[in-house]
Amino acid sequence: MFKFASAVILCVVAASSTLAQHNPHWWGNRNTIVHLFEWKWDDIAAECENFLGPHGFAGVQVSPVNENIISSGRPWWERYQPISYKLTTRSGDEQDFGDMVRRCNDVGVRIYVDVLLNHMSGDFDGVAVGTAGTEAEPSKKSFPGVPYSAQDFHPSCEITDWNDRFQVQQCELVGLKDLDQSSDWVRSKLIEFLDHLIELGVAGFRVDAAKHMAADDLSYIYSSLSDLSTEHGFPHNARPFIFQEVIDHGHETVSREEYNTLGAVTEFRFSEEIGNAFRGNNALKWLQSWGTGWGFLPSGQALTFVDNHDNQRDMGAVLNYKSPKQYKMATAFHLAYPYGISRVMSSFAFDDHDTAPPQDAQERIISPEFDAEGACVNGWICEHRWRQIYAMVGFKNAVRDTELSNWWDNGDSQISFCRGNKGFLAVNNNLYDLSQDLQTCLPAGVYCDVISGSLVDGSCTGKSVTVDSNGYGYVHIGSDDFDGVLALHVDAKV
């Protein structure tokens, strides 16, 4: 009886812990994460204080923090080739990182670190030197900065069959030396690394290449982590938020369902299908059943995005900043529709897959610069600073915890819907105008369209819609309008 009771208690504790790992620990009504890809720590700290906090962003996903290999030309992917767990990269050192986390937490913006638990660096001719000056011999699986040696890795093999679980989880992903997460030593070093980040005040982790690690091994690692730091404002017993990179197109041998109980999972099908729709390959009317109706994960288990730092560089349906009108429309729908844990992308300009972040002649990452409108101008794209995107972050905050209602469509790619009695979105992805009296569900009054402008000193700088006593308003979105979307909410009422 005692053994049975103990087993039940352990199961309940484990279940509670994994459920807690789905909680992103947002402040108030905030509920959007931004990925400030390759930004420096001091620039992120300033952005939290000057822009993200004031505009209601909930958190930042930051690039990998651990020491990485130095590759010729400094491509972005060198950050995904660890040399040690020292917190020194081109984004800054441990002191810079700790200062950034503290300053962002102070203004209600949480930090989530992209962590590399699957592997170390790939082959390198001779001795490699990392960003903290640590030497390693990746070809010999020798990483004295941790330290790891050959016995801490799976035997080298190439992934040639993506339907072979053994290859996917024990061979080398694009030649990266594959750690053995079942090893007590490897587990201890990974837990030590993550716990140190928790001590510094982070709210959670994006786990890179999660599908290439056995779910049981990850479960052990996650459950062994410390609670979040109360010194950084987290409540007692708060668990780190976990979201895991698992690419699953629905026919994978290693599936997302093996990981979604451990934490949230990146819902790549969301990205692909929203790109298809707003590129015109699917009528928007079908988005009424968006989310689980499309076979996606349950809302609280799905990390959703229009694009990420990987797939924005690939050919195909995925939208990126290079198709700005469609990208802004897709992002508006993403942030308005009540599904998923939302993350928006903040990129730098690229011409090919390997393009480095903006850097100077000494290969130091440069800080973003802004024009009079607040947009980035020196190689950083900063989609999160586009009015049409940060305004939708505010929309998402204003309508939090409301249901979708009053879906309307024209039988093709003009749609609208309400979020309770707090918000309304209309989209026109047809080649002809949308001109229609539509149910907005809003109280009577005049509302500013937060896509084309904003509410300033009691008046609208862009379009406005007058809502009558029955909740109806006349909506016009021309086919050649700069933006193909209109958004109203209660915090933008004149």
From Swiss-Prot:
It comes from the Eukaryota. The record marks 310 as: Transition state stabilizer. It holds the Pfam family Alpha-amylase_C. One of its GO terms (cellular component) is extracellular region. It catalyses: Endohydrolysis of (1->4)-alpha-D-glucosidic linkages in polysaccharides containing three or more (1->4)-alpha-linked D-glucose units. Chloride binds at residues 206, 308, 343. Its EC number is 3.2.1.1. Belongs to the glycosyl hydrolase 13 family. Monomer. This is Alpha-amylase-related protein. It comes from Drosophila varians.
